[in-house]
């Protein structure tokens, strides 16, 4: 099954320590500014998949992360579909305010920080820390930053810094933009809850050091050598080139991380549950008839065992963009 990349876990760690902008605010205009520069100007993003059987129609807009910082997203196709839609499905944002952040840092310090008076270099394998330190200096100019955080959290911060330097952002929320458009069209919105703070804490609490190191390795490979692929993928999304996105395969280290997470950990359970929750939500809307628009991460949609394959297996017709 094609699952969300290890960035899901890294980003979750970022959410927990408050380095993530709340995605619930949305935008006030139909043309939604997604941030600041790899591709500039107004872009439509990819077309939508059309899943249907009988009188039931499901339009799926594939989201992606990271995306170019400097594009303005606007899709006339989305606006047209909203004119005939009964319901919009979007991921429920995980909101953490400053009070929650402080509470987490006080009560869950052992989950997020190294602890015991140690530093990152004391708990991370020497070869990984050497690579981490090299990239940290390259992207931040700071030789001591994040030394008190556990490896997966520190690497998450570094990954976001690298994204920023190359003109990408993982903070851009297509769901929030579609949520705003749905309100303007008077369309009902259903938020699909995929994870809560407790789920993410459990995933971090139960993650074994060997699994953590495997996923840190995957993230470091992303930072060291995979940024060009991510830039290419982000540009393909902005220009609507779905075939290009499908052909840009992830490094083997990412697959190794996913395999480690799947080996009975709470993180693996969380990833599987996210997939199952989305499939159940999409099928429920199809069974209810009418027209639904959903915003779903492309990593969950595409490839063997993705949500589109699941829907085909259940007898639904799936038309590509």
Name these PLM-found stretches.
Residues 1-6:
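Positively charged n-region of N-terminal signal peptides that target proteins for export
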Residues 8-19:
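Bacterial N-terminal signal peptides
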């Amino acid at each position: 099954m094609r699952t969300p990349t290890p960035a899901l876990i890294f980003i979750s760690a970022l959410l927990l320590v408050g380095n993530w902008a709340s995605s619930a605010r949305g935008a006030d205009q139909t043309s939604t500014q997604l941030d600041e520069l790899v591709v500039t100007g107004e872009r439509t993003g990819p077309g939508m998949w059309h899943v249907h059987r009988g009188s039931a129609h499901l339009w799926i807009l594939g989201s992606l992360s990271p995306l170019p910082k400097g594009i303005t997203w606007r899709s006339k196709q989305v606006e047209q579909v909203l004119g005939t839609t009964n319901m919009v499905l979007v991921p429920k944002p995980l909101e953490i305010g400053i009070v929650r952040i402080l509470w987490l840092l006080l009560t869950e310090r052992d989950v997020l920080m190294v602890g015991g008076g140690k530093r990152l270099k004391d708990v991370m394998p020497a070869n990984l820390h050497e690579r981490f330190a090299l990239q940290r200096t390259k992207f931040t100019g700071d030789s001591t930053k994040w030394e008190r955080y556990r490896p997966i959290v520190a690497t998450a911060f570094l990954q976001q810094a690298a994204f920023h330097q190359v003109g990408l952002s993982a903070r851009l929320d297509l769901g929030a933009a579609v949520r705003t458009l749905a309100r303007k069209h008077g369309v009902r919105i259903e938020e699909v809850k995929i994870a809560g703070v407790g789920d993410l804490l459990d995933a971090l609490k139960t993650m074994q050091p060997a699994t953590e190191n495997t996923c840190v390795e995957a993230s470091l490979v992303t930072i060291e050598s995979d940024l060009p692929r991510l830039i290419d993928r982000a540009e393909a999304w902005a220009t609507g080139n779905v075939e290009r996105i499908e052909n840009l395969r992830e490094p083997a280290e990412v697959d190794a991380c996913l395999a480690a997470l799947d080996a009975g950990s709470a993180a693996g359970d969380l990833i599987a549950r996210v997939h199952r929750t989305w499939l159940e939500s999409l099928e429920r809307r199809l069974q209810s008839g009418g027209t639904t628009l959903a915003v779903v991460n492309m990593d969950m949609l595409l490839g063997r065992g993705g949500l589109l394959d699941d829907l085909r297996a259940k007898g639904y017709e799936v038309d590509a963009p």
